[in-house]
Amino acid sequence: VSVRLATLRRVTETADLTRVPTAKDEARFWALVEAAWASLGPEPAALRRALATRDPEADDVDPYALDAWLDPFLARLRDLCVDLSSRELTDFDRVVERKLYDIDRQDVHNVTDGSDDGFLYCRGWIVAVGREFYEAVRADPAMAVLDAGCEQMCYFFAHLHSERFGDWPDTGSGISRESVSNPAGWPEE
């Protein structure tokens, strides 16, 4: 029995070191993002939809029109998080971390451009715009936008956690949201 418990403890500790977001956490995260956007009315909804469905070669959608809505979106997102626990904020930070990591790719950077920080902030913008746009960029990096940025989204839940609970959340993911940290996204040339 003690051998089994020791083995279980090691497996659990290892699993905690490389914790990935659950499907439930991801669904809750995207629902929260959508709720924050929905509260702002039809104009940003139409802009977001147009961004996610546009022809990246055409000039018929101004991708920067959404920038005026980012601060109200972030304020509303903050309001929606007021009653979240430490664990919930950590879970959401883990989701953001994973989403940023998954699009930390050279093919996305080729479209967005930017320094390491600039590319991180652009990926934050992609996440902030919502799931439909995020998935469009994942599938076709040409959908990304040159020099867009939302620095606040990159550490949004981590900052809330720090403000409310006095420390930075430990996501236990074993990955980094920083630029050029996803080796699968940056093949050696």
Please state what every model-predicted region is.
Residues 8, 12-101, 105:
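N-terminal domain-onset segments
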Residues 75-148:
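Core of folded catalytic or high-affinity ligand/protein-binding domains
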Residues 24-25, 32, 64, 117-120, ...:
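Alpha-helical structural elements
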Residues 131-136, 140-189:
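Basic, alpha-helical nucleic-acid-binding regions used in initiation and control of genome expression
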